[in-house]
Amino acid sequence: MLELSLRMCIDYRALTKVTIKNKYPIPRVDDLFDRLAQATWFTKLDLRSGYWQVRIAKGDEPKTTCVTRYGSFEFRVMPFGLTNALATFCNLMNNVLYEYLDHFVVVYLDDLVVYTIYSNSLHEHIKHLRVVRESKEIFESD
């Protein structure tokens, strides 16, 4: 199905030049595959627009200003394209899901992989999915 939606792309090169880079390590895809090799069940949850759930630090909103023919706008949430967006988002998801990491959840970029290794039971996998779903911080914003 063709999705006809707009995705804003803002040139943040000037902001990037003065941004202190977050050195948060992005997981290696081969580590992810090693982790999932024994999984009987797994589900990939795409946290689409996940960045839009992360609040910009108070006072930093003017740094995200974009000017259009309709006026100038500041983001209150983290837009796609900021240098530290991916690291910030991964760090947040790892903090929210800390107690489940490497038990039945892996965070990879803006995706969550929920997996079941120790049981062939679909019922057990569904329980894992519910636990993740009930981590409300993932699905709600201020």
From Swiss-Prot:
CDD domains in alphabetical order: RT_LTR
Enzyme Commission designation: 2.7.7.48
Localization (cell): Mitochondrion
A GO CC term attached to the entry: mitochondrion
InterPro entries per UniProt: DNA/RNA_pol_sf, Rev_trsase/Diguanyl_cyclase, RNA-dir_DNA_polymerase, RT_dom
GO molecular function, one term: RNA-directed DNA polymerase activity
Keyword Metal-binding annotated: no
Main location: mitochondrion
PANTHER family given in the database record: RNA-DIRECTED DNA POLYMERASE HOMOLOG, TRANSPOSON TY3-I GAG-POL POLYPROTEIN
Name used for this protein in its record: RNA-directed DNA polymerase homolog
Lineage: Eukaryota, Viridiplantae, Streptophyta, Embryophyta, Tracheophyta
